[in-house]
């Protein structure tokens, strides 16, 4: 379950765009309105506390998962360059409500990872983090050797997610856990 006082990173400011203080944001969210709809947002630099800032406008770059965003008080290219590597956050208690079988990716962290071997479920590790570039990847730490492996989060490899009972079942191709 999601802790109500936590933050979820939904975007990363990767660079400035133009000379009027716009920034380029790499989306880590399925909800585009987070970068399009004006309103208050939260920014975080490295491990500093998040701070409020108002999103004035935004648009999605055609054919990409990036957005060009204008933030209140960021009016020059130099201002925008200062925000490079900042995270755009939302509070986990403000996450959209989902349908019964849906879940937020953040809820996968700390779930046990199980495989089906000889008709028995065997716990092999836990999800310690997520990576989201073009595809979602689960970062799993294996119990047997504390090795970290990346597992593509696709139905063929992760056929079952059980948030209520705190585990996922994976069906990795041969050799994936040995990489």
From Swiss-Prot:
Subunit structure: Binds ribosomal protein uS19.
Annotated Gene Ontology cellular component terms: cytoplasm; ribosome
The organism's place on the tree of life at top rank: Bacteria
Role noted for this protein: An accessory protein needed during the final step in the assembly of 30S ribosomal subunit, possibly for assembly of the head region. Essential for efficient processing of 16S rRNA. May be needed both before and after RbfA during the maturation of 16S rRNA. It has affinity for free ribosomal 30S subunits but not for 70S ribosomes.
Stored Gene3D superfamilies: PRC-barrel domain, RimM
Name of the protein described by the UniProt record: Ribosome maturation factor RimM
MF GO annotations: ribosome binding
Family statement: Belongs to the RimM family.
Pfam families in the cross-refs: PRC_RimM, RimM
InterPro entries listed in its UniProt record: PRC_barrel-like_sf, PRC_RimM, RimM, RimM_N, RimM_N_sf, Transl_B-barrel_sf
Domain free text: The PRC barrel domain binds ribosomal protein uS19.
Gene name tied to this protein: rimM
Subcellular location as annotated: Cytoplasm
Chain coiled-coil ranges: none
GO BP of this protein: ribosomal small subunit biogenesis; rRNA processing
Keywords, ordered alphabetically: Chaperone, Cytoplasm, Ribosome biogenesis, rRNA processing
Domain PRC barrel: 100-176
